[in-house]
C-alpha cells in the first residue's frame, strides 16, 4: 500500500503488525480510545521491604520468563550502565526471546549485540539506535521487526496498550528504600526522569535501580513510590562524565555559524517572534549558535520568550538566568549546565514525556510551540526528513522528538548542510521518511534557504528580507552538481524495521542492507 508520503508499505507488514499506513499528520485528531492499565500487586504490610539484594534477585521476584518485554530510559545517554547490567543477568539466567522497549539505545549498549545474535533479545522497540545495535538490525541479525517510535509515539503506544511492559528497570540518581526516585542529589545526576514516568505508571513490575540510597522520603519525587515494586542498590548506574559532558559550547565552524545567523534572521522576521513566544531547539552546533544569537536580539529588542521547551542545553538556561525566558519546561538535559539549572532555578520545570509530546492525550506541550529548530541527515524535495537511517542504509540515529515537535510547532525549521561530507543532504528522495514534509516549513542550508510552498504566508512575509532564498529543487540541484547524483542504497526485500508515525501508523519501513559479493581478481 502507498501511504500519504508516497512510501510503499508491504501488505504483509501491515498484516503482521496490525497497523495502518500513514494517512497524514493530523489524521487521528479528535480520536477517542480507552487507556490500558497495569497489573498491580498491593503492599499493606509495613514490615515488608522493597529492597532486593541485586539485579538477579529483582528479576526472580518480578517473575522473569521467556518472551517478556523489559523497558529502560536513556537519560544517562552514553553513560548508561543499567541496560547492559540487566541484560547480562538475563542472559546468564538463560532467559530468551526478550523485547527491549527503550526510550533510546546508543553506543553504550554495544555489549548487548551478542544477546541479539543468540536469541536472548529478539525484539527492539526504541526511538532509535546507534552503534553496533543499529548494524545488527540493518544486517538482519534481530529475529523480529525493530520498531522505531518518536518520544511522543512511545508514550502513546504504552498508554494505549499497544505495548505492554512486563518489567521496567528505572535508573535513578537517588532513591529511598520505598522507591521515591529523583534525578538529582546523587553521584550520577541526569536532571530529569521524564521518559521513565510512563514506564512506572504502566509496567506490571517496576524496579528502581540506584547507586545512591537516601533517607525516606526522597522528595519531591520524579517517580513516586506508589508505582515501584522493588529497589535495587548497585555500585554504579552510569558514568557521570558521559551523562553530562560539560557546558555546551558555541561552534567555531564558520559554515554552522552562517546557518545559525540565517536561522535567527528568519525567525525574527516572522509574525511569531513577539513577546511571550515559545521555542525549542536541538543540541547541535548550529542550533546552539542560533539560540545564542537569538538571545542577543531578544535582549536588544526587549522581547521575552514565554516558554523554552524540550531537551535543554546551557545556552537556554543562560537565557532563563538573564530573565529573557519566563519558563523552561524540560524532558531531557544535555549538559551539566542544564542539570544544575533545574536544581536551582524555580522557573525550570520537569515534565513527563506524555506532557511533552504524546499525540494521544488531551493536548501536549509541543502543540504550543511557535518555533522548533531541528537537524536532519537528509531532506528531500517534498521536505520529508530522515533522522534514523544513514545514507549507507545503516540505522544510525533516533526520531526523538523530531516528528512530535514538527507536527506541533507553528514554524518548523530544519538546519542541514547542503552536503554531509561528500553526500548530498538535500536529495530527490530520502532513504527513509521519519518526519513528513507536511510538517516541515523551512530548510536552511549553507547554500540557501527553501520555504515549503505550503507556507505561502511565510513566503509572503519574507519577500523583502535579505536572505538567500531558493527552491528546495534548486538546493538539490546544487548538491548534485557539486558531488554527483548519489547511487541508491541497495537493500534486500526483507523488512527489518518499521518507522512508526507518532500516531502509530507506518510511515516507512527499513530493509536489510544487501550483502555484496566480490569476485576474486583473476
Name the predicted role of every residue range.
Residues 1-522:
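Conserved alpha/beta enzyme-core scaffold
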Amino acid at each position: 500500500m502507498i501511504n500519504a508520503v508516497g512510501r510503499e508499505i508491504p501488505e504483509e507488514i501491515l498484516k503482521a503488525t496490525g497497523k495502518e499506513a500513514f494517512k497524514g499528520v493530523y489524521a487521528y485528531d479528535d480520536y477517542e480510545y480507552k487507556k490500558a492499565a497495569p497489573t498491580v500487586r498491593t503492599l499493606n504490610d509495613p514490615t515488608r521491604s522493597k529492597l532486593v539484594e541485586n539485579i538477579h534477585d529483582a528479576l526472580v521476584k518480578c517473575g522473569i520468563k521467556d518472551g517478556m518485554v523489559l523497558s529502560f530510559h536513556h537519560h544517562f545517554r552514553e553513560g548508561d550502565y543499567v541496560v547492559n547490567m540487566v541484560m547480562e543477568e538475563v542472559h546468564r539466567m538463560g532467559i530468551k526471546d526478550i523485547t527491549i522497549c527503550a526510550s533510546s539505545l546508543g553506543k553504550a549498549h554495544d555489549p548487548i549485540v551478542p544477546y541479539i545474535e543468540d536469541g536472548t533479545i529478539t525484539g527492539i522497540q526504541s526511538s532509535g539506535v546507534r552503534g553496533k545495535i543499529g548494524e545488527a538490525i540493518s544486517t538482519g541479525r534481530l529475529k523480529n521487526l525493530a520498531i522505531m517510535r518518536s518520544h511522543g509515539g512511545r508514550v502513546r503506544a504504552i498508554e494505549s496498550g499497544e505495548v505492554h511492559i512486563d518489567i521496567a528497570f528505572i535508573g535513578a540518581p537517588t532513591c529511598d528504600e520505598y522507591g521515591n526516585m529523583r534525578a538529582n542529589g546523587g553521584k550520577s545526576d541526569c536532571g530529569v526522569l521524564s521518559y521513565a514516568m510512563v514506564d512506572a505508571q504502566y509496567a506490571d513490575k517496576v524496579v528502581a535501580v540506584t547507586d545512591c540510597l537516601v533517607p525516606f522520603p526522597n522528595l519531591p519525587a520524579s517517580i513516586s513510590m506508589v508505582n515501584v515494586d522493588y529497589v535495587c542498590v548497585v555500585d554504579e548506574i552510569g558514568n557521570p562524565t558521559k551523562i553530562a559532558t560539560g557546558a555546551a559550547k558555541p561552534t567555531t565552524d564558520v559554515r554552522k555559524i552562517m546557518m545559525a545567523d540565517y536561522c535567527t534572521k528568519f525567525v525574527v522576521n516572522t509574525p511569531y517572534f513577539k513577546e511571550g513566544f515559545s521555542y525549542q531547539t536541538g543540541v547541535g552546533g548550529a542550533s546552539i549558535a542560533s539560540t545564542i544569537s537569538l538571545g542577543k536580539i531578544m535582549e536588544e529588542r526587549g522581547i521575552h520568550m514565554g516558554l523554552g521547551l524540550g531537551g535543554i542545553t546551557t545556552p537556554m538556561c543562560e537565557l532563563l538566568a538573564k530573565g529573557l525566558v519566563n519558563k523552561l519546561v524540560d524532558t531531557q538535559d544535555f549538559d551539566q549546565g542544564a542539570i544544575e539549572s533545574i536544581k536551582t532555578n524555580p522557573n525550570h520545570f520537569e515534565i513527563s514525556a506524555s506532557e511533552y509530546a504524546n499525540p494521544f492525550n488531551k493536548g501536549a506541550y509541543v502543540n504550543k510551540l511557535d518555533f522548533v529548530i531541528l537537524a536532519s541527515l537528509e531532506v528531500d524535495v517534498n521536505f520529508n526528513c530522515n533522522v534514523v537511517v544513514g545514507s549507507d542504509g545503516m540505522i544510525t540515529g533516533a526520531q526523538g522528538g523530531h516528528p512530535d515537535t514538527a507536527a506541533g510547532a507553528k514554524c518548523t525549521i530544519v538546519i542541514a548542510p547542503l552536503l554531509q561530507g561528500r553526500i548530498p543532504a538535500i536529495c530527490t528522495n530520502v532513504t527513509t521518511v521519519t518526519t513528513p514534509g507536511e510538517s516541515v516549513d523551512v530548510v536552511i542550508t549553507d547554500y540557501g534557504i527553501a520555504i515549503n510552498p505550503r507556507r505561502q504566508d511565510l513566503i509572503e512575509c519574507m519577500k523583502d528580507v535579505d536572505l538567500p532564498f531558493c527552491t528546495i529543487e534548486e538546493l538539490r540541484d546544487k548538491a548534485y552538481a557539486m558531488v554527483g547524483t548519489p547511487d541508491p542504497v541497495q537493500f534486500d526485500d526483507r523488512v527489518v524495521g518499521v518507522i512508526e508515525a507518532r500516531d502509530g501508523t507506518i510511515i516507512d519501513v527499513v530493509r536489510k542492507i544487501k550483502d555484496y559479493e566480490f569476485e576474486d581478481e583473476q
